[in-house]
Amino acid sequence: MEQFEAISVEQAYLRWKEGKTALVDIRDPQSYEAGHAPGAFHLTNSSLHTFMQQTDFDQPVMVMCYHGNSSKGAAQYLLQQGFDVVYSIDGGFEAWARSYPQDITSESR
């Protein structure tokens, strides 16, 4: 895959439920801690190396941001780093929270 694929929040949710696709959240730490999809890896510049060590490059990766815009650049970057299949979630976390409020968790302090 040379180009990431944009997918709907519904498609992302189904892939997430199957458990075969890695989900990364690239929002700022405060937003991530306030609420994110369970199991989402908080991908930042400082956690990228860890993510790349822990994730098989042939495992599909979905990228979530706030609204589905920033995730496009991050998805393309992950492809350039060697991941085979990368998706950008249209609508981002805002669409996820609106459609699947029962599937949001927050960090306990």
Swiss-Prot record:
Catalytic activity, EC: 2.8.1.1
Reaction(s) catalysed by this chain's protein: thiosulfate + hydrogen cyanide = thiocyanate + sulfite + 2 H(+); thiosulfate + [thioredoxin]-dithiol = [thioredoxin]-disulfide + hydrogen sulfide + sulfite + 2 H(+)
Record-annotated Rhodanese domain positions: 17-105
Keywords, ordered alphabetically: Cytoplasm, Transferase
Enzyme class: transferase
Gene3D superfamilies: Rhodanese-like domain (3.40.250.10)
HAMAP family referenced in this protein's UniProt entry, alphabetically: Thiosulf_sulfurtr
GO CC annotation: cytoplasm
Protein name (record): Thiosulfate sulfurtransferase GlpE
Family statement: Belongs to the GlpE family.
Protein role: Transferase that catalyzes the transfer of sulfur from thiosulfate to thiophilic acceptors such as cyanide or dithiols. May function in a CysM-independent thiosulfate assimilation pathway by catalyzing the conversion of thiosulfate to sulfite, which can then be used for L-cysteine biosynthesis.
Biological processes, Gene Ontology terms: glycerol metabolic process
NCBIfam families per the UniProt record, alphabetical: PRK00162.1
Active-site residue numbers: 65
Alphabetical list of InterPro entries matching this protein: GlpE_sulfurtransferase, Rhodanese-like_dom, Rhodanese-like_dom_sf, Thiosulf_sulfurTrfase
Localization: Cytoplasm
GO terms for MF: thiosulfate-cyanide sulfurtransferase activity
